[in-house]
Amino acid sequence: MNCWELLLAAWSTCFFSVPSDGLQRIVLKKMTSIQENMKIRGKDLENFNMDWNSYVKQLSELNETATVVVTNFEDTQYYGEVNIGSPPQTFRVVFDTGSADFWVPSSRCDPLYTACRKILALEYQVIHNQYDFSKSSTYKDNGTKFSIHYASGRVKGFLSQDTVTIGGISMTQVFGEVTVLPLMPFGLARFDGILGLGYPARSMSGILPVFDNMISQGVLKEEVFSVYYSRNSMNSHLPSGEIVLGGTDPDYYRGTFHYVNTSRPGFWHIQMKGVAIKSNVLLCQDSCTASVDTGASFITGPTSSMRKLMKTLGVKEEGDQYLIECDLAPTLPDISFYFDGKAFTLNSSDYVLQDMKSLDNLCLLTFDNLDIPPPTGPLWILGATFIRKFYTKFDRHNNRIGFALAV
């Protein structure tokens, strides 16, 4: 066997071997969120949040049936890597159950937009990888234009086709090349693009979502993916997070899954039958809709409900944040969320963050106000704060979400 045959054999083993458990995995890494990045550089996040909520409201008033992706990416902390093209071009993407489209910045991104300029890296230390079709031998032109309204801004571009590799699975995929990218939040993000894990009905570009492409090709053990976020960044034998395609990993949870059927076709929405402090049900006595969203970090809810919850806890609202003296954080009570009669409980160590660099002895609660108007809202969003505590299984075949206590 000559050297080229040896190289080919080694390459095939690395890229096409099938794991013994039949599952494919995407390692997730933790990053500095946009919120943290702005705080470090003394930028005014409060004004951004006011503009962001105003933007959602304006869209709903323009068209009551307008579809808006409600994920607030400014607090997103986890990303994974995907490869596009031949040879591969690597991108950091947020895997988002709140949307269904897949896009990355294009090398043809309009320099009139600040987020497309390389000079952005000098001020915010953010460098975005851009897809260059001319460097890929497997690229195919599509050219269809698309526009996606996120709660935090709008991206625009055109569709292209190329080989995409995710979690060891390679396939031909249509995706978006973004040429219009707003500075807030995407220009300041540590990630490059978004890979939606929502249902096909959520796709605003009209393309077949990545997960559905995998299903159609029969490469998954089950029509399921599961999400793990490490609860302890110092836990060296586990990654910061992982998405398991085709099933679940028993090393990431204890006990069994409790399943909740989705409440709205085409959405990862479930009915929440109560929010309680200790055993006292304070909110959602008559049911609320909750979205389990891997693209979000905090737990968000309608302003009136969130303020009632925080007031009961004795927590003060400062600007756009809920803060408490760190010395008092351990005294905060448990908060429970009820699904189909079962309580999923967070204690204070699950929902309070301490900034070790802060000099004011104030800790941040990972709750936030978010008023989403009809027809999508009102809506609660359960982000990483919840998923870190409960390993989450998204079951497309049975249209349900399962929760198990994470390790």
Regions found by a protein language model. Name each.
Residues 108-110, 201, 249-251, 305:
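Acidic glycine-/aspartate-rich tracts in secreted/extracellular proteins
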Residues 143-147, 207-213, 312-325:
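Charged, amphipathic alpha-helical segments
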Residues 196:
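C-terminal reverse transcriptase regions that engage the nucleic-acid substrate
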Residues 238-287:
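Flexible, small-/acidic-enriched active-site or ligand-binding loops
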Residues 60-69, 73-190, 322, 336, ...:
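Signature of the N-terminal lobe/flap region of pepsin-like aspartyl proteases
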